[in-house]
Amino acid sequence: MKVKELRDLTDAELAKKIDDSKDELFKLRFQLATGQLDNPMKIKDVKRNIARLKTIETERKLGIR
């Protein structure tokens, strides 16, 4: 998702996205450890997405945007 689309989400939807992304990261790490992961770059993408979501969450708490 684009950052603009993420900013349009409600706080509850944002929290849900963060939880879903963390679950996905856990599954990807497990696949990496067992040698089943086809694309290791997927881990990097998910981690960046989590960082984006947390940044938006922090901005809202601080009233920056």
From Swiss-Prot:
Sorted UniProt keywords: Ribonucleoprotein, Ribosomal protein
Pfam family, one: Ribosomal_L29
SUPFAM superfamilies: Ribosomal protein L29 (L29p)
One example of a Gene Ontology biological process annotation: translation
GO molecular function: structural constituent of ribosome
Record-linked Gene3D superfamilies: 1.10.287.310
Signal peptide (from-to): none
CDD domains for the chain: Ribosomal_L29_HIP
Family: Belongs to the universal ribosomal protein uL29 family.
HAMAP family reported in the protein's UniProt record: Ribosomal_uL29
Record's protein name: Large ribosomal subunit protein uL29
Organism: Desulforamulus reducens (strain ATCC BAA-1160 / DSM 100696 / MI-1)
Gene this chain is encoded by: rpmC
